[in-house]
């Protein structure tokens, strides 16, 4: 977002530069890429055009309005990720369950809330939050984490899921791992205040738990 460039230089110690005097050039270039993409999709994947246009519209709305609105910005970030997942499900012809959508949405909301909490601690410029909002966001991220755990628990208790696994009870082991990952994330971020990308690459406990989750989940799946 060109509008946040100056603030991001200070917030994130960016090493690259952008000629902000050529905003029109960036706009025309981005518009050209979008139109080209729409034309290609019109002939190859017409169903995805609506998704791309929706994503583009929300992006504009977020960058120029919602990003400066408390809590709406967190929700919008989650929507971005859900749209990408839906896009991928169409591209690979995969059906998404309600459990999966709500679970992912809750995780994205937890991460989004934590991202804003980190920005408060680091005193980022051009953000709608201040230190007085810290406690509210801390509670929000915990609530979203608990909702994600609850959704995975409900999925584990759902007997319909058994047709997708060799052993329906092993899924409870995945539930335990999810609980540990959420606890590890919240506890680690409480002490370190890392950007989510930095957390993913540096937190070894989370990496081990994540790998263990997928190994158990996929090895128990009837599709492999």
What kind of region is each of these model predictions?
Residues 1-34, 67:
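Aspartate-rich (DDxxD/NDxxD/DxxxD) Mg2+/diphosphate-binding motifs
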Residues 1-3, 46-62, 104-106, 169, ...:
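Membrane-embedded alpha-helical segments that form the functional core of polytopic membrane enzymes
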Residues 4, 73, 183:
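Residue-level signal for inorganic ion chemistry
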Residues 23, 45, 49, 70-71, ...:
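Hydrophobic, aromatic-rich alpha-helical transmembrane segments
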Residues 25-92:
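Intramembrane alpha-helical segments
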Residues 34, 64, 82-224:
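C-terminal membrane-associated helical module and adjoining short loops/tails
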């Amino acid at each position: 977002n060109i509008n946040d460039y100056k603030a991001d230089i200070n917030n994130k110690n960016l090493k690259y530069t952008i000629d902000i005097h050529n905003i029109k050039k960036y706009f025309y270039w981005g518009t050209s890429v979008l139109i080209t993409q729409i034309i290609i999709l019109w002939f190859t994947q017409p169903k995805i055009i609506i998704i791309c246009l929706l994503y583009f519209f929300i992006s504009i709305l977020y960058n120029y309005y919602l990003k400066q609105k408390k809590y709406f910005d967190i929700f919008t970030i989650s929507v971005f990720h859900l749209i990408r997942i839906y896009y991928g499900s169409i591209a690979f012809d995969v059906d998404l369950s309600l459990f999966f959508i709500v679970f992912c949405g809750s995780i994205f909301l937890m991460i989004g809330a934590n991202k804003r909490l980190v920005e408060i601690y680091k005193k980022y410029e051009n953000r709608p939050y201040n230190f007085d909002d810290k406690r509210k966001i801390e509670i929000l991220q915990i609530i979203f984490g608990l909702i994600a755990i609850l959704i995975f628990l409900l999925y584990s208790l759902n007997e319909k899921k058994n047709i997708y696994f060799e052993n329906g009870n092993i899924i409870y082991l995945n539930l335990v791992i999810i609980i540990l990952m959420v606890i590890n994330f919240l506890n680690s971020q409480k002490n370190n205040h890392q950007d989510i990308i930095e957390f993913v690459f540096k937190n070894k406990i989370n990496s081990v738990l994540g790998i263990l989750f997928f190994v158990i989940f996929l090895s128990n799946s009837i599709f492999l």
